[in-house]
Swiss-Prot record:
It comes from Prochlorococcus marinus (strain SARG / CCMP1375 / SS120). This is UDP-N-acetylglucosamine 1-carboxyvinyltransferase 1. It is an enzyme of class 2 (transferase). Gene3D superfamilies: Enolpyruvate transferase domain (3.65.10.10). UDP-N-acetyl-alpha-D-glucosamine binds at residues 106, 322, 344. NCBIfam families: murA (TIGR01072), PRK09369.1 (NF006873). The active site is at 130 (proton donor). Pathway: Cell wall biogenesis; peptidoglycan biosynthesis. One of its GO terms (cellular component) is cytoplasm. Keywords: Cell cycle, Cell division, Cell shape, Cell wall biogenesis/degradation, Cytoplasm, Peptidoglycan synthesis, Pyruvate, Transferase. One of its GO terms (biological process) is regulation of cell shape. It catalyses: phosphoenolpyruvate + UDP-N-acetyl-alpha-D-glucosamine = UDP-N-acetyl-3-O-(1-carboxyvinyl)-alpha-D-glucosamine + phosphate. InterPro entries: Enolpyruvate_Tfrase_dom (IPR001986), Enolpyruvate_Tfrase_sf (IPR036968), MurA_subfamily (IPR050068), RNA3'P_cycl/enolpyr_Trfase_a/b (IPR013792), UDP_GlcNAc_COvinyl_MurA (IPR005750).
Amino acid sequence: MHSVSSISEESLLPFLRVEGKNDLSGQIKISGAKNSALVLMAGALLTEENVHLNNVPNLTDIDVMTDLLLHIGANVNRNTNQVLLQANQSDLSKNELPYELVHALRASFVCIGPLLARLGEVKTPLPGGCRIGCRPIDEHIQGLKALGASVRIDNDTVIAKIVNSRKRLIGTKIKFNCKSVGATETVLMAATLAEGETILENAAQEPEIQDLANMLNKMGANVQGAGTSQIKIEGVSHLKGCVHDVIPDRIEAGTFLIASAITRCPLTISPVIPEHIGAVIKKLKQCGCSIEKAGKGLKIFPGEKISSVDMSTSPFPGFPTDLQAPFMALMSIATGTSKIEETVFERRMQHVGELQRMGAQISLSENTAFISGVNELIATSITGGDLRSSAAMVLASLSAKGTSVIQGLNHLDRGYENFEHKLSQVGAIISRSPNKLKIDTKSSEDLQKFSSGTEVA
């Protein structure tokens, strides 16, 4: 076990200092869903009129999407949690997405759908790799081809073009080989301006897709069945502007529910749509927590002890892969043994080593972790290797004995708005420092590796 003081090498990365074993109480406000807001911003490319989005989280991923839309000629104005977008045909001067932005934000690849439908041709680099496994774009490409587009890959650039004389995509029936959220969103947006009816089978069912469909329908699209495995889209010739509120972030809500459980302190989380986190609520209740509705949110009362439960990730409505790492942190101090299986991504277990540094008893077999709960974790110097494992490190530190130092904040800032401030407001002793931090040399290689990675979850 390495203590915070066993250090010998300097890092310029900012860090969090978290003092464990402090009681939390009060209410945490949940921000708008990052994974929804990003796609809604891309969806605004489907019309020349103004699209006004409310409840947009202030995150670095939103910054990147803003830069990308500005690069291709769209007008984007941001004010706190509001975004006003307009994509005039005459202003969309570029149909090629810049490598550095697509590489930084994989979610930007969904722009290929609306840009193809609007401009008839689009070029985009292959999306940047992330540190949690392979995310093939085959489903995106096959879906666009099925709509009549010519799609090829040349020197790591995807080139998509409408080649028919009518210069419109043509509706058809498309069956995805796997439930891909990104591919469902890409093809759904493209199909709204296609000629005729498009039917998407084996479509992803995530709430963010429902949110996208709701906005598109406000814009004049005809989308039915979003949230089920079959989505029907009747194409229209043009779409109009709209005002739309981004749904609450279900992953952030789940993260703070787990924060309550791991500290054994009751919290109120609001706003929350309970149906969006049903699998998480079910598992927390099995752990011994009591959860009840409280206005537009939920109140959680952790039990005197946390019971171990097995969990397997799966696409919605199953347990979300984005909460696998925080839930493993919780199971690390649960009574008994548990098994956590990651079925969505093949390399999403980087947090195991960091939890072990804190004293967690975890053995790993490929994508399955076996956890024997310990009485308490011990504070140390740790690193979040991706967005959700960074959050897991904070939760583990809240329950640990002593003061932990956490690096990897570049990941954390991609998906959690004012994360440490929200925790401070309910009693956590947590502070961010931009200063130099001396780090344990044994973890310096991991810090270098993780700090250069990209992450979208």
